[in-house]
Amino acid sequence: LTNATEADPVLLPEPGVLPRALPTPRSISTPTLFGFSLGMIGDRIFRDTPALLLMLFMTDYLAIPPALAGVAIFVPKILIIFIDPMVGVTSDRLNTPWGRRRPLMLIGGVLASLSILMFFHVPRFGLAVPQAIYMSAMVLVGFTGYSLYSVPYLTMASEMASSDVERRTIMSWRVVFMAVGLSISAFAGGLAQSIGGGVKGYATMSWIYAAICLSTMLSTVVATGRIATSPGDGERFSLLDQFRLVAANKRYLRLVLVSFAQKLGEGVGYTSFGYFCIYVVHQPLSAFGLVVLASTAGQVLAQPLWLKASRRWSGPTLYTVGALGWCLNLLLWLAMKDQSPWWLIPLGLEAGAAAGGFQMVTLGMLSNTMAADATETGMN
């Protein structure tokens, strides 16, 4: 990525003739963009609510040792690395009256939403190990459902657009709705405390969040019913062949590796933030809401600026700026011990502005890389 120039090779140039594998060019209407992006709320609720609260719930309410809780969450997420490509292969091969993306999105949305309930309705085995095994199994089931939804959802974004500008616009909308989903997730802990706290409070909260997750994800499935996605090219590849194709696509491989490191860093930050907020900065769990509300505002307000900047500078350059801004924000948190909680607002604003940048750029480059690969290989 660091070798990219102003004419970013990851961003697809405007082609004179569209490849046969992609849909006919079209202008994407605002209602379509809204309906498509709405699913990002449920997407982020599923990802961020467990990321922010699950470790705390397991250690503080289920009495699972932190190391065991960490392993219980980490191991199934490693397995998901292998499930994602299998979902992609399945989605590419589907040929149904409802398209090849939406059936998996429907199944995944339902499964992911039900898993939110399972995360916070844990059988009381009386021992830490059986409870950790249960949680690990639920994480595997839940994130399998998330893969079934998110993999075809992201692919659909590249198929909807016929130019780089449209793809960046789609991703900018998604980042805004992503910020809304993250904001809702941030209030989950405070909501659980306000409706009784403890295991019962978390269980009640999970019903509310599962309903929001399900309604927004399925709304996108319905809203995208008229979006034409290209049929599969008929070629079939084994999973090993799929990994070989990925390894041969250097642009995609670089982007995936960078994205993996980014998601790993974000995940560590989200998971540790609850402990950091309570035990280091000495703020209540409800402070999550204040921080992420400010972060959401930062993401939304900064999106037009990032979108404008993406027309002038390369994706890797903007990604670097956003990532450095995020890292600087994390360092500033170290100086927040026993400080006024009002400092959380400017920190949240800066974090949101930075994160909104590198998230939009990453999604945009991924979508463009997929479109470029379809152009070069004729396969979709």
Regions found by a protein language model. Give the residues of each.
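Membrane-embedded alpha-helical bundles of multi-pass transporters/translocases
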Residues: 2-380
